[in-house]
Regions:
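Amphipathic alpha-helical packing segments from all-alpha helical-bundle domains
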Residues: 121-127
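Alpha-helical structural segments
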Residues: 15, 19-26, 44, 61-83, ...
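Short glycine-rich beta-strand segments
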Residues: 48, 104-105
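Short glycine/proline- and charge-enriched loop/turn segments
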Residues: 3-5, 116-120
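N-terminal intrinsically disordered/low-complexity leader segments
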Residues: 1-15, 26, 85
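Helix-turn-helix
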Residues: 19, 23, 30-61, 65
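Short, structured loop/turn "capping" segments at alpha-beta junctions
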Residues: 106-111
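Alpha-helical structural elements of signaling/regulatory helical domains
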Residues: 33, 58, 83-87, 105
Length: 127
């Protein structure tokens, strides 16, 4: 029986789903397009190429998870910007500035979130 110390590298990854989403987001934040392969991301994370399919049926499912994480982050940034304001009007303006700032900091993710892929995707989560 193999112990954890004897297991091959990448044999078990406790948070593989989150690690793959994070690797995909880092890929986009590095200025790259979403044209990566799941194999490329699994290599970065240190697991076998087939391990990703335990969490994502396809690359499209991973892209959906990445877009959802982008929307979650954008929502948190806008909410934080709104809460820091004294009036509704100032909060509305702050939310708009947070939206633009997010798009400027994460242009590839923003394109994924608001581009054709999400618009044409039938995912219930993205509606």
């Amino acid at each position: 029986m193999e112990t954890a110390a004897e297991s091959p590298p990448g044999y078990h990854h406790g948070n593989l789903r989150e690690a793959l989403v994070a690797a995909g987001l880092a890929h986009l934040d590095a200025g790259r397009s979403p044209d990566f392969s799941l194999r490329e991301l699994t290599r970065q994370v240190g697991v076998s190429a087939n391990a990703a399919y335990r969490h994502f049926a396809s690359k499209e499912d991973l892209l959906i998870a990445m877009a959802l994480e982008g929307f979650r982050r954008l929502t948190l940034e806008q909410a934080s910007a709104i809460q820091a304001q004294a009036s509704l009007a100032a909060g509305f303006m702050a939310a708009g500035r947070a939206y633009v700032a997010f798009a400027q900091r994460h242009p590839a993710l923003f394109r994924l979130m608001f581009g054709r892929f999400v618009a044409s995707n039938g995912s219930e989560e993205l509606r």
